[in-house]
From Swiss-Prot:
Reported cofactor(s): Zn(2+)
UniProt subcellular location: Cytoplasm
Residues binding Zn(2+): H60, E64, Q174, H182
Family to which this protein belongs: Belongs to the SIS family. GmhA subfamily.
Cofactor note: Binds 1 zinc ion per subunit.
GO biological process annotation, one example: D-glycero-D-manno-heptose 7-phosphate biosynthetic process
Name of protein: Phosphoheptose isomerase
Gene Ontology CC, one term: cytoplasm
GO MF terms held by the record: carbohydrate derivative binding; D-sedoheptulose 7-phosphate isomerase activity; zinc ion binding
EC class (word): isomerase
Binding site for substrate: N51, G52, G53, E64, N93, D94, S119, T120, S121, S124, Q174
Note: The reaction produces a racemic mixture of D-glycero-alpha-D-manno-heptose 7-phosphate and D-glycero-beta-D-manno-heptose 7-phosphate.
């Protein structure tokens, strides 16, 4: 395959997955918007976490909440749990990497808050433990996964939302994850500021 054809195949694969994801995830995505909006309307907070590219997605999502998405509005209460290197290194050193998010959820999370947990495999132990801590603290969880959902998919309760991308390739899952996070931001803004579309 020549390089142009190889590059073209990325667009074709992404478009096909966008269509599949639209069919599978539009309804639960709308439910996730309602969950986030309800938490914010009740003075709750949104915590987000992930590893690697998913950590970057968590940070990106929270930046859109605290800053703005496309329209000016008041800042929204969001915390990316992967951004404080002192906490991450202290907890990682003293308790182990698997606890870096769990301890923060236990410290910061309150009943009615929402944890946005991101893992392309659904099996990241530290994100799984964050979900378990969120459940113990009577928080809601929005899990962004792929590859069938893994352990995180098994932890989802009727009070949570699972956004599982129907694909096994990590980069394609990550591409849909950022689309989902942007859609969540748009939905929150539509409920806060009115629908402009």
């Amino acid at each position: 395959m020549d390089m142009t054809s190889r590059m073209t195949s990325h667009f074709r694969d992404a478009m096909a997955l966008c269509e599949q994801s639209m069919q599978a995830l539009s309804e639960p995505l709308a439910g996730a918007v309602e969950l986030l909006f309800a938490a914010l309307a009740n003075n709750g907070r949104i915590l987000a976490c992930g590893n690697g590219g998913s950590a970057a997605d968590a940070q990106h999502f929270v930046a859109e909440l605290v800053g703005r998405f496309e329209r000016d509005r008041l800042p929204l209460a969001g915390i990316a749990l992967n951004t404080d290197t002192s906490i991450l290194t202290a907890v990682g050193n003293d308790y182990g990497f698997d606890e870096i998010y769990e301890r923060q959820v236990n410290a910061l999370g309150q009943p009615g808050d929402v944890l946005v947990a991101i893992s392309t495999s659904g099996n990241s132990p530290n994100v799984v433990r964050a979900m378990e801590a969120a459940r113990d603290r009577e928080m809601h969880v929005i899990a962004l996964t792929g590859k069938g959902g893994g352990v995180m998919g098994e932890l989802i309760t009727p009070h949570d939302v699972h956004l599982c991308v129907p694909h096994d390739r990590t980069m394609r899952i990550q591409e849909i994850h950022i689309l989902l996070l942007h859609a969540l931001c748009d939905g929150i803004d539509a409920l806060l500021l009115g629908d402009t579309e």
